[in-house]
C-alpha cells in the first residue's frame, strides 16, 4: 500500500434544507479520511483507511461502499461497544452524533506498526483530533509512521472540522500542537485565518517551518504555492487536489529524506496542470 489515512467514517444524511425541515435524506459516506482515500484510489493509487466502525448495518454498509470505491478496508476495525457515527447535513448546517461512537473510540492500543512499514505516506486531518482516544491514536500513528520512514502529511482543514468540535478555540490550539509533527502541510487560506489571523502565508511561514516541517502546499482561491525552506513554485489552480499532489510524490519516489533538497522544477511538476505529470518517476533533485 502507498498511503495510510487515519480518521473517522460516518453515515452522512444530506438534505437540501435544514435537517429539522426535511423529510427525505440522501445517505452518503462521510468523514475526511474516507473522502481522501476515495480520491487517491480514483487516481489509481493504493490507499488504506485506519478507522473504527460500529458492528452494525451502517458500519457494514459504509465499509462495503468504500471497498467498492477501491479503498483498502483491511485495516478497518468493528466494535459492538459503540455505534457507527451519524451526521445530518443540510442548508449549511451540520448536526453530528459522534460522542460515544465507534470512530472516536479507536485507541492507540488498536494500531500495529506493520502497516506503516509498507506505506509511503501517513495522512491525517483535524476532525479526529478532538479530545478522545482517537487523538491518542494519532500520536501513536505519527510515531509509527516516522519510525517506518513514511511521510507524515497534515491537512488541517479547520473550517471543515469546526462544526465537529465543541469549541473553535480548542480546535485551533490543537492544530497548532500538531503542525510541527508533520513533514508536509497542505494548507488553505481559511487555515491561516483561523490559526494566525491572516490569509497571507508570508506572515506565517517562519512559524510554520518548525519541527519536522519541510514542505508546505498552500491553496489560494485561484493559485497553489509550494514551499520548501529554500525554494518556491506556484501554478494556476485547477484540479491539483492534495490527493493528486501526494500521488505524484509517490510516483516520483519522493521520501522524507528528499524533501530538503527538492528543486523548483520538481515543485513545478507536483503542481502541474498536465495530467500526464502523474507518469513522471524518479525526477532528479
Segments from the language model and where they lie:
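Glycine-rich phosphate/adenosyl-contacting loop at the front of the ribokinase-like
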Residues: 1-71, 267-285
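Short pre-catalytic strand/loop immediately N-terminal to key active-site residues, enriched for Gly-Thr
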Residues: 21-30, 205, 230-237
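Conserved N-terminal subdomain of the carbohydrate kinase-like
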Residues: 46-126, 278-285
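Hydrophobic beta-strand scaffold residues
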Residues: 47, 73, 152-154, 186
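Active-site-proximal loop/turn and secondary-structure-junction residues that shape catalytic pockets
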Residues: 128, 158-160, 191
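Catalytic-core regions built around general acid/base machinery
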Residues: 137-148, 173-181
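Conserved phosphate/ATP/ADP-binding segment of small-molecule kinases
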Residues: 162-230
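Conserved post-catalytic alpha-helical subdomain immediately downstream of the catalytic base
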Residues: 211-215, 228-285
